Each structure stands twice: as C-alpha cells, then as structure tokens.
Amino acid sequence: YTFVPVVLIVSMFTFSDRVERQVTGPKTGADRQVTVEVYGKQWAWDFNYTDENVHVTGVQAHLDGSPGKEAELPTLYLPVNSNVDVVLKSRDVIHSFWVPAFLEKRDTIPGMTNHIHITTKEIGDYKGKCAELCGEYHSEMLFNVKVVSQEDYDNYINSLKQNPENQGIAGDQYNRNPNQNATPRPANQ
C-alpha cells in the first residue's frame, strides 16, 4: 500500500523537476548573452549592467498628491536577439520583479539571489512593476523595459559610461531616505 504511491510521487517529482529546469534555465539560440543585476528597494529599482560596469539607480517613490511621471521611472534597456540573465536581489524586503509581457515573475529576497532567463526577440517598450506588497509606496514601484537594437543599446551604455554618476556597480548598500536617490554611488572599479 505504500510502495506504489511512493513510486508515483517520486516519478512525478522527477518529471516536474526536469520540466521546471528547462523552463527556468538559461536560454540558448540568441546572438548575445547579457547579464543585468536588478536590485529591488523600497520603493524603486536599480539596474546594474555588470558586463559594462555601469548602473542606473531609481528614485524612491514618495507620494505627494501629484501623479507620477512615467519619464522619471527607471528604465531597463536590453538589446534585441539576446539571452538575458536577470540577476535579482533585494536591499530590504521581499519584492517581485514582474514584466507581464515576459510571462514570468520572480521574487527578490534579502540575502538570496534569484534569476530570470529571457530571450529578447522583438524591439518594444514594456511595463514592469513590483508584484509583492512591500510597504506603503508599493503601488509606485514601477519601471520600464526597452528592448532596442544593438546600436541603440550600445549608444545607451556609452551615455551611461560618460556620466560619473552611473559608473561602477551599485552594491548592497542602502539608505532609506524618501524621495531621494539615496543609494550611495559606487566607487569606480
């Protein structure tokens, strides 16, 4: 009475684990591999372009009664036809990186690193948000994703390299001052 159920459970686990690894594992077949480190923080997103040694820090949301401006949202730029390893981390509480068009959502958990592997197949603009209730300004924790041509991506990265504020990789440091870009600027590496 126990042998058959145990065999069924073990076989279902084995097949489920194999399928999950195929779905969530690194993708193949694109022209280029890109790694982007994404930090969730109350209440904004920071993007490290680790291959390029530059970063973008999001300004923390602080509601003042006026509508937010989409132009001020942090934007993650990705080149088209690339395999992207999105490395997810959190500076404070659990957040959830979600771009509905990518059909995948993953939590950012303090002290833990998660990954999302995506392949960028078409140029376009996409909306992203935190999908985990993370505090009083959670609803303002929005970001944009722009999938652009390789030339536009290179131009964007070069513009970041020209600005000393964006040089280096933003690490785990965090200062929770509202309505300020309070993440300390990293030392150039």
Where does each model-flagged region fall?
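Non-transmembrane, membrane-proximal soluble domains of secreted or membrane proteins
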Residues: 1-189
